[in-house]
């Protein structure tokens, strides 16, 4: 397993839809293992393949639900269903706060559906379907968004969208080729402090 650099906002691999996986899952095992390792070292709860520069429709997760129970898995060619996404401003009390390894160190309230269901293949090539509510549902929506070519900053509204644009510009995340290396660079979210 190898920790790979995480691509930062501004790179085209993050802003374009990923490609459907057509190869046999046996050919993906090294990539999937690297994704898990990178996510773990980065202290993330999810990681999409394009976040490490690979334009394939795959994501991994190791995320708690609202009761603190951890859920770990991999989806290949995931299909997402959700309940209605609220059109109101997200809560400003921290409950809707979202961050992203590709927007390092930033976090903004993001409106998401409370319920989500993801269907696809796991790393063994078996068809799986997982339903989730709350934080785990948020994780699924976030990761599938990556695979569709969107970052969470693209779905922000109101002042949060304006603040995100300012942060992206201030950090110089408007051009391709920027990365950070989990385990080597300082943790942008302060987990190693």
Swiss-Prot record:
One of its GO terms (molecular function) is metal ion binding. Fe cation binds at residues 100, 142, 146. It is an enzyme of class 3 (hydrolase). The keyword Metal-binding applies. One of its GO terms (biological process) is translation. It catalyses: N-terminal N-formyl-L-methionyl-[peptide] + H2O = N-terminal L-methionyl-[peptide] + formate. Its EC number is 3.5.1.88. Binds 1 Fe(2+) ion. Its cofactor is Fe(2+). NCBIfam families: pept_deformyl (TIGR00079), PRK00150.1-3 (NF001159), PRK12846.1-4 (NF009483). This is Peptide deformylase 2. It comes from Corynebacterium glutamicum (strain ATCC 13032 / DSM 20300 / JCM 1318 / BCRC 11384 / CCUG 27702 / LMG 3730 / NBRC 12168 / NCIMB 10025 / NRRL B-2784 / 534).
């Amino acid at each position: 397993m190898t920790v790979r650099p995480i691509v930062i906002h501004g790179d085209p691999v993050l802003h374009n839809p990923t490609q459907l996986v057509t190869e046999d899952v046996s050919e993906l095992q090294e990539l999937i293992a690297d994704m898990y390792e990178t996510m773990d070292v980065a202290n993330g709860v999810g990681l999409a393949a394009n976040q490490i520069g690979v334009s394939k429709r795959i994501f991994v997760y190791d995320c708690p639900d609202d009761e603190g129970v951890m859920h770990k898995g991999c989806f290949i060619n995931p299909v997402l269903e959700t309940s209605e996404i609220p059109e109101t401003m997200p809560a400003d009390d921290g409950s809707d706060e979202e961050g992203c390894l590709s927007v390092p160190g930033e976090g903004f309230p993001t409106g998401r559906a409370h319920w989500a269901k993801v269907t696809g293949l796991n790393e063994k090539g078996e068809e799986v379907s997982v339903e989730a509510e709350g934080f785990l549902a948020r994780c699924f929506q976030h990761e599938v968004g990556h695979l569709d070519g969107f970052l969470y900053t693209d779905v922000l509204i109101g002042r949060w969208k304006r603040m995100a644009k300012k942060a992206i510009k201030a950090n110089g995340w408007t051009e391709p080729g920027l990365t950070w290396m989990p385990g080597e660079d300082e943790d942008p979210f302060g987990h190693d402090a």
